[in-house]
Amino acid sequence: MQVQATAKWVRVPPRKARLVAEVVQGMPVTEALSVLSFMTQAAAGDVGKVVRSAAANAENNFNLDRDRLQLLRVDVDGGPIIKRFRPRARGSSYSIFKRTCHLRAVVEDNLDRPTRQRARAPRPAVAASDPAASVDDEEE
């Protein structure tokens, strides 16, 4: 079962939030929160807040065990841009764009997903002869 939580109009640029979100995608929730707590980026606090909220939604609304939750994905979408102007010389001005983003964390109970066994391709047969001997034959 997938459970989600959203945070809108977060005052972090989407580009910086995506850098943090890519690190924790696919991790177990407890491990992701531990990693986020040690990250120095400002967006780590906001991403952690959304992940904690999604885990709390799963725990309280759907009676799922917090230790079995897997962070499926963290979506970062661009929000509205706050525009400000900085006065410059001779009556001109520079634009300042304060970007915002919308965050959505999706967690799921990792026992719901069936575990797949990857079929391994057969390895090519290794030649019985010594590779060094074949190099000597080619030089002659």
Task: List each language-model region with its residue ranges.
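Structured, basic alpha/beta domains of bacterial-type, RNA-associated proteins
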Residues: 1-136, 140
